[in-house]
Amino acid sequence: RIDASVTPARLETAVIAAAINLNNELSEWRATQRAAGYTTLAEVPGDRIKDVSVKVHLYRRAIEAGTGAEVCERYRDYSATNTGSEKAEALTPNIDDYRRDLRWAVRDFLGISRTTVELI
């Protein structure tokens, strides 16, 4: 959860960073869709929920999760007091949860399994 101590400017920076990272990760997929004649994500055929493309929902989810992780990571770096250190330690599971949610949203978006398994 992002509290009021995060300024709008910091939040905007985190959203932009999340969007840049996500767009870079989806660049090949986007190129394929553009080659097929789709100019926006909403135009790409697929299932819909509440009249919005599932891909749009997943993209938004990935941006939200990436933003949350970015803000939590930066927020814990700003505090140097003992209380701040305790807050920073408490944020670590949230960061991991945000990163997991980001991975899942991207994998669902791309239609690949959420689980990576390697044989040893």
State each model region's role.
Residues R1-L41, R107, G111-I120:
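Conserved short "hinge" loops at termini or chain/domain junctions
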Residues Y38-Y59:
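Short, exposed interaction segments that mediate macromolecular assembly or regulatory contacts
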Residues K55-I120:
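Short loop/turn elements at secondary-structure junctions
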Residues N21-E28, R48, A69-D77:
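Amphipathic alpha-helical interaction surfaces
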